[in-house]
Structure formats: C-alpha cells, structure tokens
Amino acid sequence: GGNSSVKGKQNIIKLSSNENSHGPSPKVVEYAKKHGTLFNAHRYPNIDGIKLREKLSTINNLDPKNIVIGCGSDETLLFAALAFCQDGDEIIHAQHGFEMYPIISKIVGATSKLIKEDENYKVNVKSILNEVTPSTKIIYLANPNNPTGTYLTRKEIIDLLKALPKNIIVVLDGAYAEYVIKDDYDGGFSLVNEFDNVIITRTFSKVFGLAGLRVGWCYSSAKIAQILKKVKGPFNTQRISQEIAIIALEDKDYLNKVIENNHNIKNW
C-alpha cells in the first residue's frame, strides 16, 4: 500500500494494489471536507458498526446480525483463520492469488496448499478437491480472482460446496465482485442460506475507492457470525471510516459510473 518510489524517478504510477483511479465518491469528499477527519475524534467508534451493518443489510437484503465489520476485508479474512484454524491445519488457496492468504496461514500456524490452475490460470472444482485432506480447515477463493481475473460460476461454487466435507469453511472473497457483469456469476450472498460453511467477504477499498480508510465486512450464517465476533476487537474500525462508508453506499450513481467505466476499458 501507499505510494511507490524508485530512485531517480518521479511520478511513478503504482498498479500493484489495484487502487480505484477515480477516487472516492464526490459525496464522500464533500462529507469529509465538511466534517474533517477529526470529526468526533474524542469518541470511540461503535463496537459493532450498527449503522453501517443496517445500511449494508438494507441495500443487499441481508440479516444485519450476520454481518461482521472489519478493518478492510483483510481483517475479515483473518477472522476466519483465527476462528477455525490452529497450528498444523491446512488452508487451501490459488497459486496465483491474493497475497494475504499465505500471510494469514503463517499468522495462525497453518500450511498453505496451492490449487493447480489450467493454462488460463483458472482453478476448477476438481483441482480444488484434489488438495483437500483431513487437515483442511479453510478454502480461500477470490471470486473473481486477483490478479488473474478468472472466476467460478454459481454452478461451480455449488458443486464444490456439495462435494466438500461440511466442516471445511469456504471463504468467497468478493473484493472485485461489483465489477463482474456475467449472467453465470453470483456474488454468493444467497449461498449462505443454502450452506452453513460459507463466508462472503466484501471491501470498500476497490469499487468504492476507500482503500485508505480500511473498511470491509463479511456475511455468513448466524452460527459462524457469532464465532467470528469472538475474535474481533471491539474498536476495529474508525468512526469516520464507518460514517464515510455509509455515504459511499448511498451514492449509487457514482458506483454505477465506476463499474461502467471499468467495463468499457476492458474492451480496449
């Protein structure tokens, strides 16, 4: 994260973190200018991000009790490992994928197992299942995947969940979910109603352009949500971050503009 620098070079363009070049919504900028970053700085943030969870539940038609707020989706990914893994367990993830997955494995003392990919750098149900052992506790699947841009269809995800032992947690990392415009793609929220071992993660860092404020969240069954809350710190997201995230959610016109622009650029 942050700015990149190369000795002797100026104005380096940093691409490695996939930051939103549009920046945040104009409404977010206006709110920040009006209130300033020290708005209510003497007050602790809400422990559970109640207002943000309620806004997320309304927009996505979800149960707010099953939403857990994190310091970026990175933290919610870590929550899963802290809650369900220990030394000697195995975590499965793609060979070419988000670098947080092997970092998280090291944090909890687990072993990373890499999913074999095809010639297009895509994983499939069979290649995932081939890595499963009695020691497997979590499978992290960025869907769509970072950095390859490949994705698993709703049918593939369902086939995988049906074939897996029910004690294995499948974390569907939807950091780039809003960008996908495909009929066979599903962001995964509906899967929570069908399978008890699914966690869906989302972030405000990408399409919403709020990477510096570190806000993310996850959605799961009530049982899993209660377990995740046990490993979450009480004040893990800033007050201003929660409030600005709500403003960003309300600016649908800007969100659609960013998505449309990304879609058009892909056709170049």
Task: Please provide the spans of the model-predicted regions.
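Structural scaffold positions in well-ordered secondary structure
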Residues: 15, 139, 173-175, 201, ...
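Phosphate-binding glycine-rich loop
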Residues: 50-90
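Active-site pre-lysine segment of PLP-dependent enzymes
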Residues: 123-134, 147-170, 174-207
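Short glycine-rich anion-binding loops that position phosphate/pyrophosphate groups of nucleotides
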Residues: 18-21, 73-74, 98, 143-147, ...
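PLP-dependent aminotransferase-like
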Residues: 83-141
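PLP-dependent aminotransferase class I/II
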Residues: 25, 197-268
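N-terminal "arm"/small-domain region of PLP-dependent enzymes with the aminotransferase-like
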Residues: 1-43
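Short, structured coil segments at secondary-structure junctions
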Residues: 63, 108-109, 194-195
